[in-house]
């Protein structure tokens, strides 16, 4: 740790022990970024581009230290200087780039791509204020901005810029990059596009802002309120800004490696994470057309490059944009989308297969399915529902495109970082190989009937619950029983996530207790959820849960 010690001296002209937690964090940030850069980056002829409206990457310091293999060394150095890595990390702002499972899956895929040593990168937007920060008053949710970008940040500005055309004006982008460390491997990039004129000061009264001022608001918020037309159009602006930058970057990188663009599928594969990036299909065709490739060939090229991940069977998640929105915002795409629709209707005239329906709504998922080579669900049951019900009409004509990719997690974060006592115990039983190959965790089955091992696991679990108890007390003032059953539901607040059923169960148990029927073991219900600002039923459910807490 001599290099870190020297860096602290050079940055702040004092020893680590005399530095504030903020100063130590800034030094660790710089040191870790240098270590990541020194590792190098995965590259190759063909690259996977994972395009997503959100990346729920979480705090990065400890995760990067673990993947670099220097976590214990850094923690020991800090301890010798009277510092705690946990306290240092509390200073770190969390990137406000994601919201739920869709964004966490994207983050886990990037971790996996880097760890497996595959050439790949993520592409998204650099939201300044995130979704929102949730605050409670009178048992009601209120929203305030969640700024996270500071002068000392994981973001690194690049010299990559593009012009993105809209009706009546163009916007210049700047690409920022965050390094994603592979475990004991090189890194990859998460590339985030931004506008230089983003103005955080235009936000007032919670998260209210002028939704029409695209020159200054485009990258302020993830999922801006879409309860009015201005909000819905802002989302279209965001989505096109994201995919136009992505498409230009991908084509430039392919050409730099020797592609003539007719062979683009040999250089790039694009994973469309839900329907937000769907406009990359017509944008690719537009850009290929500018480079002299005719429409039919361009459509064929794109159909071998793009793949689509479906996350939910909810109709609202299968985005449908009025064609007049696109005419108002990205008119250059409308003739392309109409041609794509005509090609589909010439072969498959059924209304439920159309890209543009009889109400002049553009079905983004339909475009992804017709002009992508793969459609995957994110769990076995989910994929079967897609094939047999929600997207059955597409499965009948494209059975070879449908496949399942069950959601996984980067267990290194959720185990090695979040539960270090359990990590050490598992390593003592089966060795260290599981840290890179999760299949080795199956070796734990040899101990499923070993009472001594089970008792030790229970002790680790109990201690973890005590830590949770202390955290809840410190942050809410509520004291919970670590010996109770922790019934935890952490999901975005939505009717289909069914937090309301859990609330009804709590009411049922409460009434039973009032009648003298106590449960065999105490139960502590823990919820974590945000409701979209204009989703009033979801906000009412939060109100119900917070009111139940006060009984």
Q: Residue spans of the language-model regions?
A:
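A conserved ligand/cofactor-binding region detector
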Residues: 1-551
